[in-house]
Amino acid sequence: MNKVNPKNTSPVAPKKVFIKTYGCQMNVYDSQRMTDSLSSQGYVTTQTPNDADLILVNTCHIREKAAEKLYSDLGRLRVMRQERTPDKPLTVGVTGCVAQAEGSEILRRAPIVDLVIGPQMYHRLPELLEKAKQGKKIIETDYAVEDKFAHLPPHNKRAVRKRGVSAFLTVQEGCDKFCTFCVVPYTRGAEISRSVEQITEEARQLIEAGVKEITLLGQNVNGWHGQSADGKTWRLGDLLYHLAKLDGLKRLRYTTSHPRDMDDSLIAAHRDLDMLMPYLHLPVQSGSDRILKAMNRQHKSSYYLHLIEKIRAARPDIAFSGDFIVGFPGETDEDFEETIKLIQQVQYSSAYSFKYSPRPGTVGATMKNHVDESVKDARLQHLQVLLLEQQNTFLRSKIGQKTDVLIEKPGRHSGQMVGRSPWLLPVVVDTESSTGSVVEIHIKNASSNSFVGEMTNR
């Protein structure tokens, strides 16, 4: 029998995956879950595509030119693959909402791509990857019959620890609202709510891995209506009360919400749960009832403003962020002024604003009376100046206050740490407190998007 000389053996190098993620927090979560799936196949993540064996581009289709960004990336990857030696092959995959929307068109325009996978098929990634390695071109953009979340592996605790003490947890996916500007119902499908049991188990996995703050995710997260173990249907408020009882969890958040699904039980949770952070992203898109109707938002501006009042009455320290679209088809100067009035009434801590761009397949793409681009530009600039003023006002209003901060990571300088304020903004503070601890700080100053604090004597 021939003996193996240990000196001539070397460990097999782990396979490396690089994932480029575009878009929303759910895409970030999806990329993390794909990483978890691949870790069971021997893959480790790398921060550079140059030494990757597998590159996945996780795409977003919400805004214009999303597909163009993808094809630009794929052009660079084509050159990278050409420069590879035979002993260092490269597999390329496209995932996310552009994958769902474009499908086979991606393979036609970019033959470098080996697999195209829609958001509902991530639980099959290891299996589909093996087929792609055998030379097959893979397209999987069907909506899964089975529950994809039930087939995803448990979180990789080591990977979770590397990501930090805050984590995303998807509880709901898809949307049934069919706003006329939005592609989400077509790329993510109908609303799916995970069960209470699934969510609780994943939350416990994250907590065991050191997570202290969980943000519940959904395209329409407050539309979540999951089944409990006894067969009852819970709403998001019920779920928040339930998760708040988990040992080791210090903070809860959720995003993104639709005004129509902000029910009284959810508002009560903001009143009753100190660990539910006083920050809410509640998009309205426009302040004009005429435009809201054209967008199929299913509410009027007065409903939204009344909702803001109810939430503030329940949680006076809450901060609101929002989304706004300018230049929707048919938007007049008067419609735009209604949006400005609404913003002035609400007083946002931050907001996202965009020029309308028609998305293929949506009702909005078939509408007439398009607004001139120069008018869109002027309106967007006007709106953003106002929103920036409100953001700065909010930041200045917190100077001199005391607040609790979740310490997340070391800062740039020795003895400095970066934490997360209740209002989501980062806080820089000189402290020896460990990552994951919650400390009280005194806000001394504010920049354009962060606070500077000092420890109190508490």
UniProtKB/Swiss-Prot annotation:
List ligand-binding residues for [4Fe-4S] cluster 2. Answer: 175, 179, 182
**Amino-acid positions noted as binding [4Fe-4S] cluster 1 in the UniProt annotation, renumbered to this chain:** 24, 60, 97
Source organism of this protein record: Bartonella tribocorum (strain CIP 105476 / IBS 506)
Instruction: Give me the disulphide-bonded residues.
Output: none
Note describing how the cofactor binds: Binds 2 [4Fe-4S] clusters. One cluster is coordinated with 3 cysteines and an exchangeable S-adenosyl-L-methionine.
This molecule's function is given as: Catalyzes the methylthiolation of N6-(dimethylallyl)adenosine (i(6)A), leading to the formation of 2-methylthio-N6-(dimethylallyl)adenosine (ms(2)i(6)A) at position 37 in tRNAs that read codons beginning with uridine.
| Family label | Belongs to the methylthiotransferase family. MiaB subfamily.
In terms of PROSITE patterns, this protein maps to: MTTASE_N, MTTASE_RADICAL, RADICAL_SAM, TRAM
PANTHER family cross-referenced by the UniProt entry: CDK5 REGULATORY SUBUNIT-ASSOCIATED PROTEIN 1, MITOCHONDRIAL TRNA METHYLTHIOTRANSFERASE CDK5RAP1
Q: Which NCBIfam families match?
A: miaB-methiolase (TIGR01574), MiaB/RimO family radical SAM methylthiotransferase (TIGR00089)
What chemistry does it catalyse, as a reaction equation?
Answer: N(6)-dimethylallyladenosine(37) in tRNA + (sulfur carrier)-SH + AH2 + 2 S-adenosyl-L-methionine = 2-methylsulfanyl-N(6)-dimethylallyladenosine(37) in tRNA + (sulfur carrier)-H + 5'-deoxyadenosine + L-methionine + A + S-adenosyl-L-homocysteine + 2 H(+)
Q: Per the UniProt record, which EC number(s) apply here?
A: 2.8.4.3
Recorded GO molecular functions are:
4 iron, 4 sulfur cluster binding; metal ion binding; N6-isopentenyladenosine methylthiotransferase activity
Assigned keywords, A-Z: 4Fe-4S, Cytoplasm, Iron, Iron-sulfur, Metal-binding, S-adenosyl-L-methionine, Transferase, tRNA processing
| Claim: Metal-binding is one of the keywords in the record | yes
Q: What class of enzyme is it?
A: transferase
Q: What is this protein called?
A: tRNA-2-methylthio-N(6)-dimethylallyladenosine synthase
